[in-house]
Amino acid sequence: MMPARCKIIRIGRAVLPALCLIMSACTLPVRAQDSSSFYGMPPQDIAQALRRIGNDHPNLQDRIEVVSSYFLGTPYVLGPMGEGPQGEFDRNPIVSFSALDCTTFVEETMAFSLDPDLAGGTALLQKIRYKDGVISYQTRNHFPSVDWIPNNIKAGFIKDITREIAGNQTRIATKTISKSAWYAAKTAAGLEGISGLSPAQEDALVSKWRSLGASIPDQKASLPYVPIGILPEVIDSIPSGTIANLVRADNPSIPVMVSHQLLIIDKGGQAYVREAAYNDKVEDLPAMKYFSIYQGSKWPLLGINLDEILPQSGL
């Protein structure tokens, strides 16, 4: 049985364990004075809160802690964000403060920590979510191992620090990613925010959607990871605000190798996981308690790949 906190991804009408492609009251001093939540705030109040965070917390690591804390309690919804009203296959909004999944939680924390301005952070978000910042379904960073992580490293938003933490105990996971099979399994049930089509129009749109993957060759994904067995030794050396990508054993029936994305946050000297928990909300859990959930999983958790969010010049 899969751990309850592992996100699932829908492939056609089937439901497979896959990418979720990240806490209780915070004890950090900054949390005491920044006790609000974005959830339920009107846009003007969100904009004001972001400006205040930017003014009060010039250090990026502090901003990551505070911005991510403002998402605590936000409900989990699978795939809450899309390409907006002009999207061809997914017309969900391009930014959301009312619902998040694990990847969109990490993305919005990144964007609004790097640029604590509502308009500026929203623009930056699209550069994080999409290859080269080009907004379309096919350029969205769908797969962490071959899209999200390498594209954001190339764009200069993150750097891999796995080897800095695990040293010579670092291991490498590999998997063949088939985007063509992933696209070929698309069905009308996966279309978001699109209505009023005749059956023929819907069939044509789904056929076009499936065709996006027809010419995409399979890709060999390779990710370094901190083995789960050494986490107790190294968890306290992971910098607060680090992105952790959960790396799973290769399973041919599952299209991904990264099943979840979350943040590692220091709270009073103890490492916590801050995550958008599947079918729940954004929350905190003690890190080692969280990772113990995966013991005995039928889809083994090999370890975690770690990425540091990098400051951006001019922001």
Regions found by a protein language model. Give the residues of each.
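N-terminal secretory signal peptides that target proteins for export/translocation
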Residues: 1-10
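Bacterial N-terminal signal peptides
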Residues: 14-25
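Sec/Tat signal peptide C-region and signal peptidase I cleavage site
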Residues: 28-32
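Solvent-exposed, acidic/flexible segments
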Residues: 39, 43, 57-65, 92-103, ...
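Short alpha-helical scaffolding segments that buttress acidic/His motifs in well-ordered protein cores
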Residues: 64-72, 125-128
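Acidic/His-rich structured neighborhood in mature extracellular/periplasmic domains
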Residues: 75-223, 239, 248, 266-270, ...
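Short alpha-helix capping/helix-loop boundary micro-motifs
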Residues: 225-234, 250-251
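C-terminal soluble interaction/assembly domains
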Residues: 244-315
